[in-house]
């Protein structure tokens, strides 16, 4: 639709058109409808609410390496594409409102739905939806500070997710599927349990871990652009999220396991990956 109305595909040419230098009449509606479709496609791929319905079932049913890939790679590439499209062209109040709504809806649904999950991968799926909501705060602001906080947020989210799925891959060897199966982890593999706990605390945004820095920058950007309600929803959903993250830690360290599972040691590659990402999550505090 955009190409049919403008005859251009180069970002510089589209920037002039989208900022109004060469836009007239009915062509304007068609162009902005095309931009809206790009935004919806992007929100679908990053699993933002209300385009998230496919994510929990796909995350649960896919092999763990595929789930890890879907949790990280598409989000990084799509956020990069959104940045290119909307930084070169006119951002537009309508698109800001779309990201504003999707950000709030994703944070709320991600926090509330994750509380009811009993399976590890489904919990991580809804956690991912919630974090997409936090990251979308950067687009909702429409400011340089918002974009900077978004870049920090997606970088830290990627590291935390790599860390979490490296642990899930290690647990896959013993066919751990339910949260209740983690009851014996602290007793049979305390190092892995401590590492998983650090990752969950970082997801929850507990200082001084990297997840706290990510949310701090995003909420600060929201306050800076006057989006006080957005920042309030983010803080409240972060507090709610602490419940299900800390529930995992409680399960690993304090609950009696329903079945005793012998966890096999991780191989060298996963151990190195886990050590590097965990170190960054723990020590990142600018």
Language-model-derived ranges and their functions:
Residues 1-286:
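Alpha-helical transmembrane segments of multi-pass membrane proteins predominantly involved
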């Amino acid at each position: 639709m955009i190409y049919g109305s403008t005859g251009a595909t180069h970002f510089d040419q589209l920037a002039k058109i989208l900022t109004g230098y060469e836009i007239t009449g009915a062509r304007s509606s068609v162009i902005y409808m095309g931009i809206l479709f790009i935004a919806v496609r992007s929100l679908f791929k990053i699993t933002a609410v209300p385009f998230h319905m496919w994510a929990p079932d796909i995350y649960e049913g896919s092999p763990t390496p595929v789930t890890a890939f879907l949790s990280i790679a598409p989000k990084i590439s799509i956020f990069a594409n959104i940045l290119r499209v909307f930084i070169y062209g006119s951002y537009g109040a309508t698109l800001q409102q779309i990201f504003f709504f999707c950000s709030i809806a994703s944070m709320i649904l991600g926090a509330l739905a994750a509380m009811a999950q009993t399976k590890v991968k489904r919990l991580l799926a809804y956690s991912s939806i919630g974090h997409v909501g936090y990251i979308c705060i950067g687009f909702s602001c429409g400011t340089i500070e918002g974009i900077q906080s978004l870049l920090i947020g997606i970088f830290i989210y990627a590291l935390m997710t790599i860390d979490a799925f490296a642990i899930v891959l290690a647990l896959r060897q013993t066919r751990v599927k339910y949260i209740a199966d983690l009851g014996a982890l602290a007793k049979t593999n305390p190092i892995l349990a401590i590492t998983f706990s650090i990752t969950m605390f970082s997801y929850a945004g507990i200082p001084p871990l990297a997840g706290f820095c990510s949310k701090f920058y995003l909420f600060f950007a929201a306050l800076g652009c006057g989006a006080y309600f957005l920042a309030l929803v983010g803080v409240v959903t972060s507090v709610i999220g602490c419940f299900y993250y800390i529930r995992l830690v409680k399960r690993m360290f304090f609950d009696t396991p329903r079945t005793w599972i012998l966890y096999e040691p991780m191989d060298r590659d996963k151990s190195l990956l886990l050590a590097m990402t965990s170190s960054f999550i723990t020590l990142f505090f600018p």
